[in-house]
């Protein structure tokens, strides 16, 4: 063939020749890409204060303020209309006693008298039946800690503990799963030469240019536009090798030479120093699981978990041995009054006198005999309550009249005045028990406010409230100090290319450029004639990154690299949204015991006991000392598992872990150094524009943007559904004591009892049976902590968590020192065939001890423990609360008349007064919440009963929800005097909608009255 002769196979590599003289400066390169942003500069000085901005828009109306303090007392209103008649006045003072009349027929029992002074002690009664359990006593002092119970089941998951202290470095773990594919690595050392590629098609000859004369080497200027290529000069004679020069500046890349024949593989070079750590690669696919490493040493003991929920009640223990006899209780309350004495002899009735006419009221005369009762007149209108008149003078006592003959039995006279107290009759037999207690009186007025009680126990943690509406913006604050320098901004777009500047001093090496798009392939030029071998050019500038090669098969595991330096802590993240609602915390500790309550009402009257033997009741003995704490009960079963706790706070950043195993080999490295420079070929025609390259890989994730401006306030949402009723709150303080009510009317007289015989003395009764077990006591205070139980078995290993998201790009680390240049490798050919996938490496050595783990989740409750054995008998407890009063003893002797009793309970409510005039309209209230969503209803409005001066607006709603649970949707009544009534009504009097002498009407639609 007429082509140029093919070169023979390449000979072995000769010894390294002496370095040639520095080459001439290469043509000026293109402008490099902009460097990566520099470190943030120091904060500038604080600028002068800017002019005031224009006033902002008016803000939204503020939330309604709290109610103001009560205003001062207003002026007196006009006199109201005449009220209704008042209650009957109090009974006037008693007049002087009249002469003693003849004994009348026994009257009906009078009103029960006030309680007399305490009589002499009665004879001792038989023991009463055991009283009901007393109220719970105050909590005793905390007893000494009991012996440690058995290890309980694991509690519910606690809240995550804080991060523990850094543990010691653990032994190396086994090989982990294959990590995801890393980012492109640094270029590797040149691979062995590939086989020769086919010869390219010859290009068209270019015109030879004229060679310029070499200039003196100046300082490296800023990159200018590329100049035109000069013509080739004549070849000079080869000079003697000069002394070794310093490394010259990198020359421009020469044209691509023809591929040589495939050489023999050279010997492996010496391993270079470790290069600087590359950027963090993207996460590769998940590798196959490695072999299990040896079991590490147990970790440090975890922080104690949160307090578990109380376990289920354990089974009841066996009955304990009977305790010692308790201390003597307080003396019982005095017994009820005895049975009435025997009936006196009936006196002869007096003859009835005639009815006298009502004369003018004179001085009080002598008492006449009682006349027969007149017929009841019609009830008169109640008169106006007059002022009480002055007290009249007492009349003289009349002389006793003569005793008249006994007449026929007249009608029963009015009851006579009480006679003198007779001598005590003999004691009668105990009468039968009276009927059950009377109805309870009406509720008294509230008492005065007692002193505030001690704090109650801490309530359960409430559910978090709904998120409140955003508040109004506050006024602009004063200008703050300049903040620290912000994070570096994102990369700006490159500016237009400037004109070439003057040649500057040699710059520092630039940072690594971004990867360029792959250009289209130009046509191959025609091979030039072999020129004489030129001097070795200076090292070329590193070429741009080649396109990313296909993913190679996983290489063998590399040697672990050194541990990188600890990264700087990240800036504090923005506050996250509120977490989900937590579960109710454990119940708080019991509060201090409350103050002693007021004495309760007396119980119902007990049955009369047989009279016991006499003897005064001894005083109450002193209260015995509190016995020691009883044995600890059996542990209850575990409670249900608690719901998952809140997520714990993020732990602090841990120290860098040991370096991972080496990743798979990176893609094919860039083209190796050029071979000997050939003669300059003729310039080729410009190639046609290549097709557009494939889109480049996604750029790095940008920094988080600043928060947007605050949006305008939205409208209030619809009201949510009613929440579940909250737990009952603690009792409010006792109300202040109300004023005493008016005197009630006297009760009806009781029928006289029959006289009983005196009973004989009874014997002591046998002791009663043991009472049934009392109700379960309230939960005691927590005992002191027992000694720690043995450690539980280690929990099962958790499942492997999902892969985390790729972290943000770390800042560039400092460049490591440059390693020495390796010898130039033989120029490689095209990539060889894909190698087989390597086998999994052997398991690594045992890793160091790992850091302390977080507290584990709370385990499920264990099964209930077995019942404990019956404990020994407890010591005698303190004296129990005072029991109820025993049965009544025999009647004591009549006591003296007692002091007058306290004021009776308030009487029934009087009639309502007439409605006063309407007051002035109140100030407008705060805006109510938005109404419920409308539902279909029809509304009819029509005036009612026009003759009423207060016409009543009526309407009926057809609403299925108008019930006691949702009164807001029921019938609403409103009068023109601004009185609104809301149905369901529980109490509606005619006075609420008009005066007593006015008519009123209400038209009510289909609503539910309860």
UniProtKB/Swiss-Prot annotation:
Subcellular location: Secreted, Extracellular space, Extracellular matrix
Biased composition (Basic and acidic residues): 58-72, 834-847
Cysteines paired by S-S bonds: none
GO CC terms of this entry: collagen trimer; cytoplasm; extracellular matrix; extracellular space
GO molecular function: extracellular matrix structural constituent conferring tensile strength
Residue ranges, compositional bias (Pro residues): 1-24, 145-159, 918-933
Predominant location: secreted
One GO BP: extracellular matrix organization
Record's compositionally biased regions (Low complexity): 25-48, 73-82, 213-268, 300-310, 324-343, 405-448, 559-568, 581-596, 643-662, 679-701, 796-805, 872-900
Signal peptide segment: none
UniProt keyword list: Collagen, Extracellular matrix, Secreted
Ranges of compositional bias, category Gly residues: 160-179, 203-212, 311-323, 468-477, 486-495, 519-528, 609-618, 633-642
Domain Fibrillar collagen NC1: 982-1010
Residue segments, region Disordered: 1-969
Protein family per UniProt: Belongs to the fibrillar collagen family.
Protein's recorded name: Collagen, type I, alpha 1b
């Amino acid at each position: 063939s007429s082509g140029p002769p093919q070169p023979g196979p390449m000979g072995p590599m000769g010894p390294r020749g002496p370095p040639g003289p520095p080459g001439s400066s290469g043509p000026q390169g293109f402008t490099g890409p902009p460097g990566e942003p520099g470190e943030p500069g120091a904060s500038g000085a604080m600028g002068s204060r800017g002019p005031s901005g224009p006033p902002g828009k008016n803000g939204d109306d503020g939330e309604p303020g709290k109610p103001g303090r009560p205003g001062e007392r207003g002026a007196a209103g006009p006199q109201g209309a005449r009220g209704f008649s008042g209650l009957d006045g109090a009974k006037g003072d008693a007049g002087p006693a009249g002469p003693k009349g003849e004994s009348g027929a026994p009257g009906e029992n009078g009103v029960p008298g006030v309680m007399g002074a305490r009589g002499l002690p009665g004879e001792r009664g038989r023991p009463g039946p055991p009283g009901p359990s007393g109220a719970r006593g105050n909590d005793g002092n905390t007893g000494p800690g009991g012996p440690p119970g058995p290890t309980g089941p694991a509690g519910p998951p606690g809240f995550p503990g804080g991060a523990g202290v850094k543990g010691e470095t653990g032994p190396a773990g086994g090989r982990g799963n294959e990590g995801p594919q890393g980012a492109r690595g640094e270029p590797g050392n040149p691979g062995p030469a590939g086989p020769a590629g086919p010869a390219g098609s010859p290009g068209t000859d270019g015109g030879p240019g004229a060679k310029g004369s070499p200039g003196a080497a100046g300082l490296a200027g800023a990159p200018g536009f590329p100049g035109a290529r000069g013509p080739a000069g004549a070849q000079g004679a080869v000079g003697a090798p000069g002394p070794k020069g310093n490394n010259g500046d990198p020359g421009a890349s020469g044209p691509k030479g023809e591929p040589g024949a495939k050489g023999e593989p050279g010997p492996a070079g010496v391993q270079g120093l470790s290069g600087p750590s590359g950027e963090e690669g993207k996460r590769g696919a998940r590798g196959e699981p490695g072999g299990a490493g040896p079991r590490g040493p147990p970790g440090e003991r975890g922080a104690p978990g949160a307090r578990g929920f109380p376990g289920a009640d354990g089974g009841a223990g066996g009955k304990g041995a009977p305790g010692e006899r308790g201390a003597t209780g307080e003396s019982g309350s005095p017994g009820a009054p005895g049975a009435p004495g025997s009936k006196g002899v009936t006196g002869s009735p007096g003859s009835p006198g005639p009815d006298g006419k009502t004369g003018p009221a004179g001085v009080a005369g002598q008492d006449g005999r009682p006349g027969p009762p007149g017929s009841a007149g019609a009830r008169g209108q109640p008169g106006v309550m007059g002022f009480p008149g002055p007290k009249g003078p007492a009349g003289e006592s009349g002389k006793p009249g003569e005793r008249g003959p006994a007449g026929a039995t007249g009608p029963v006279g009015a009851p006579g005045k009480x006679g003198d107290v007779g001598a005590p009759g003999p004691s009668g037999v105990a009468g039968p028990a009276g009927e059950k207690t009377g109805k309870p009186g009406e509720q008294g007025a509230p008492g005065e406010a007692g002193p505030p009680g001690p704090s109650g126990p801490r309530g359960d943690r409430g559910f978090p409230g709904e998120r409140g509406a955003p508040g109004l913006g506050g006024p602009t604050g004063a200008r703050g100090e300049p903040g620290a320098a912000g994070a570096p901004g994102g990369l700006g777009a490159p500016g237009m290319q400037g004109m070439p500047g003057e040649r500057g001093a040699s710059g520092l090496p630039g940072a690594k450029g971004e990867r360029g798009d792959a250009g289209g392939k130009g046509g191959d030029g025609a091979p030039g004639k072999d020129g004489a071998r030129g001097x070795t050019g200076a090292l070329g500038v590193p070429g741009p990154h080649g396109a990313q090669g296909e993913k190679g098969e996983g290489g063998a595991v590399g040697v672990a690299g050194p541990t990188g330096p600890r990264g700087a802590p990240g800036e504090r993240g923005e506050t996250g949204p509120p977490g989900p609602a937590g579960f109710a915390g454990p119940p708080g500790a019991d509060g201090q015991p409350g103050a002693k309550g007021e004495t309760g009402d007396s119980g119902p009257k007990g049955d009369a006991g047989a009279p016991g033997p006499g003897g005064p009741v001894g005083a109450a003995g002193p209260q015995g000392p509190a016995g020691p704490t009883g044995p600890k009960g059996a542990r209850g079963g575990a409670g249900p598992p608690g719901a998952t706790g809140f997520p714990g706070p993020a732990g602090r950043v841990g120290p860098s872990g040991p370096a991972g195993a080496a990743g798979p080999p990176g893609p094919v490295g860039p083209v190796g150094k050029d071979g000997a420079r050939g003669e300059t070929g003729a310039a080729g025609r410009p190639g046609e524009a290549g097709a557009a390259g494939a889109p480049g890989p996604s750029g790095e994730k940008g920094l988080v943007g600043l928060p947007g401006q605050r949006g305008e306030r939205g409208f209030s949402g619809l009201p949510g559904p009613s929440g579940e009723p909250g737990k009952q709150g603690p009792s409010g303080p006792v109300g202040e004591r109300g004023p005493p009510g008016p005197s009630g009317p006297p009760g009806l007289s009781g029928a006289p009892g029959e006289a009983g015989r005196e009973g004989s003395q009874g014997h002591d009764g046998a002791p009663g049976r043991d009472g049934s077990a009392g109700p379960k006591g309230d939960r005691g205070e927590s005992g002191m902590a027992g000694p720690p139980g043995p450690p539980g078995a280690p929990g099962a290993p958790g499942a492997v968590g999902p892969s985390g998201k790729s972290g943000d790009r770390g800042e560039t680390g400092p460049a490591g020192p440059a390693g020495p240049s390796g010898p130039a490798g033989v120029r490689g050919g095209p990539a060889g065939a894909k190698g087989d996938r390597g086998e999994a490496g052997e398991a690594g050595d045992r890793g160091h001890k790992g850091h302390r783990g977080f507290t584990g989740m709370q385990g499920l409750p264990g099964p209930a423990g077995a019942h404990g054995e019956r404990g020994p008998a407890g010591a005698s407890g303190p004296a129990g609360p005072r029991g109820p009063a025993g049965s009544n003893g025999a009647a004591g002797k009549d006591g003296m008349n007692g002091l007058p009793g306290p004021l009776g309970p308030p009487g029934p409510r009087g009639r309502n007064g007439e409605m006063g005039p309407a007051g002035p309209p109140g100030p407008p209230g705060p805006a109510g919440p938005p109404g419920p969503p409308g539902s279909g209803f029809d509304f009819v409005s029509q005036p009612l009963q026009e003759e009423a001066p207060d016409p009543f607006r009526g309407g009926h709603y057809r609403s299925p929800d108008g019930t006691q649970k949702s009164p807001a949707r029921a019938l609403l009544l409103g009068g023109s005097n601004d009185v609104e009534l809301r149905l369901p009504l529980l109490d509606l009097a005619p006075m609420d909608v008009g005066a007593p002498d006015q008519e009123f009407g209400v038209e009510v639609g289909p609503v539910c009255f309860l």
